[in-house]
Amino acid sequence: MNMQNFHYHFLKTNNELTLIADDLRSIFDSTLEKVISLTEEVETDIVVRHSPINSIPELGSSGQYTKDARCIDVYLDLDSPHLKSNFETEIARTLIHEYMHVVREQYVPWENGTLLDSLIAEGLTQSFEIEVQPTLPPSIYA
């Protein structure tokens, strides 16, 4: 697989991600390999930052996609006990979920979507999470 279409950016303002950057790259590479085998490859920037305020407290992580820039933002709370004990699972789950939004956006652009549109989009991403990780339930925080 050609991983040149995925650009990882680890924000280093306070060096919080320095010690885990290689682990994150490894998780991203293995997760994207599975994802691409089930869908298509869309050039995407993946930006990771330590941001407790943007993380879901129960997970220690969260993510979002930026449709026009084909960018995924991954927010981590590196002090979260849940994230520390479920690091690979939560990172992979976030990437799978947000990447599916990026792929969907290529075919069904989001413009002034309704609540129904949001429910459908989140349902599709959760179904994809199950397809990629069949032994794990999808996140309840879609």
Regions found by a protein language model. Give the residues of each.
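Auxiliary, metal-adjacent structural segments of Zn-dependent hydrolase domains
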Residues: 9-70
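Active-site recognition of the HExxH zinc-binding catalytic motif
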Residues: 93-106
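Membrane-interface helix caps and helix-loop-helix hairpins in membrane proteins
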Residues: 108-111
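Post-HExxH zinc-binding segment in Zn-dependent metallohydrolases
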Residues: 115-142
